[in-house]
Amino acid sequence: MRIWGLPMKGRGETGLYSFFRWIVVPLFGGVYRCRVKGTENLPDDGPVIVITNHKANLDPVIVAMFFDRPLRFMAKKELFGNAALRKFIVSLGAFPIDRGAGDRAALSTSLEILAGGEVLLMFPEGHRQRDDAVHEFLPGVGMLALRSGAPVLPVAMDGTQRMLRDGRPGLPALRALVGPPLDLSDLTGRNSKAYQEAARRMRDAVAGLYARL
């Protein structure tokens, strides 16, 4: 079982984090049938941007089940308005983003995470999608990849959208496929055209993996 929810770099382990690390995540993995392929592509160290399609709120947990390193991820700023909820999701590696505007603070935090050699999990579609398509990726993920120079690891997932079908808990099979890191080295520009092309390649990579699930 892989671990999710390690605290931010330099912070001590909290009781809440320990609870999720040793109890919740293992229980989750034991209840749901998870089939993961391509784990040999997961890097053991160094910065990496993990990109995947987004179907449910529990998607970060699914990635954490097969990723052996702490994950940091963006969450919509509205979730940080409540003090108790804010403390909870921050302890799991989340930081806020304003999805309705260009968020320089979120970009700065993301670059800092990658500069520190950490793992940044991103859902470049921007919102949860319930259909069977991988939608267009926002160009911001391309900008982040090119500005940071961090490897980009594509992942496709399916099944999480059926975990609460019609508001009732379900036990669907969860499938994930991890692809090899993308080569974006030919995109030397730092402009909107290059960022859009990088985002397009990322989307195509995830869509290709999704078609193989």
Q: For each predicted feature, which ranges?
A:
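N-terminal membrane-anchoring alpha-helices
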Residues: 1-33
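Non-catalytic C-terminal accessory region of glycerolipid acyltransferases
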Residues: 2-15, 105-213
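A short, flexible N-terminal coil/short beta segment enriched in small residues
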Residues: 2-6, 42, 64-65
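Catalytic core of membrane glycerolipid acyltransferases/transacylases, capturing the structured
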Residues: 18, 22, 29-30, 44-101, ...
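A short, well-structured juxtamembrane/interface segment
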Residues: 25-46, 184
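Secondary-structure boundary/capping positions in well-ordered alpha/beta enzyme cores
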Residues: 34, 69-70, 95, 117, ...
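Structural motif corresponding to alpha-helix initiation and N-cap regions
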Residues: 36-39, 82, 104-107
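Residues at the C-termini of beta-strands that transition into short coil/loop
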Residues: 40, 77, 98, 156, ...
